[in-house]
């Protein structure tokens, strides 16, 4: 099979990369009704599989789970989760032939085997759903022409998909129809009903394409979302210890610092995050971020180039075929790093202390978010998509580090994200070591003293922060999510 994106001509590639439309609330007036009375079978019962299924059932849909015979016979975790939540569970052969919509929510590396198994069992005119388009775009999976292929991609982990639904809200979601597989022209109706059933329409839905979702998702997770946090954690910890900081304190400052810093990012973008600093610290963080952007820009561009060309995917799929040798080696090496093995700090670190003593970390977040966003937009991805795949998801990933350091992050994210994370962080750490050697007192681990600043310089820096394109689109999207949340809670 050929990489689907690479079979398109340049005009088609640009059209699919640039497909992104923020959908109006009125477009979801029918809710999930298009799928009511139809049989929806989910393949896979992991975090997305279970939590999407719970939401869809609560929205009035007929949901069941198709699992491998061995998973049922051995009562594996997927079987236990589905049955304990009261779902009907059966084998592929028992459930797939009756399904109107089959949703494949297994890990990326299992998609080809799953799709090749279920396709012959699917009835004529059924629909196949994904929450990530890797199998279609990068693997180039060929789907029967009578089958409609759609995607609903919540921009949050499965657990948050469920929690936001229970609160009467939802999470921002991308939906798409594969242009090669919409024989009856009903793909968009199916995708909208599925998104509404998960609650996504209450938080904002982008009509996108399989191509735009995959290319932007891969770029975000490899660079700012995972790779930058891993590289930053390792570099900052080593620098703090080298400067004489207690390893336990250094570990806590970093482990919980990312989450604290990005909580401000979530509420008010880069502007609010930078406003948490004193004026002298803000000016220093801005200067550091500009240096970091200049150093890291070629690395971000290389990752985007390799994602667009398919080189990243072909390399990762070769590792799949080699029993994940590279992935497992990198995972083991990460677990042995000084940051991961440092003792726990029992003392308390106040919220503002994370900002005051984490100026470099804030600079890394700012540089990484802006670079990821800029690189995606320069490649033809629309700003709204780039925002969701950079700034929006960062607090969610930072939260995983706060739970159990880098180990937890790499367990929670997909194997695809983890593989890309290692590629980036293994290149980024040596790249930034000369920069780390030139840091000044107050950049990390110590607060920058209050002092006079030049009003003109502060004015210009504030304007540069606020006028960046990601701040403009972010303000619009965050405002929409807030408005939608008020509507959902009220009604």
Swiss-Prot record:
Keyword Magnesium among record annotations: yes
GO cellular component: cytosol; protein-containing complex
Keywords of the record: Amino-acid biosynthesis, Branched-chain amino acid biosynthesis, Cytoplasm, Magnesium, Metal-binding, NADP, Oxidoreductase, Repeat
Activity regulation text: Inhibited by N-hydroxy-N-isopropyloxamate (IpOHA).
Record note on quaternary structure: Homotetramer.
Similarity-based family: Belongs to the ketol-acid reductoisomerase family.
Name assigned to this protein: Ketol-acid reductoisomerase (NADP(+))
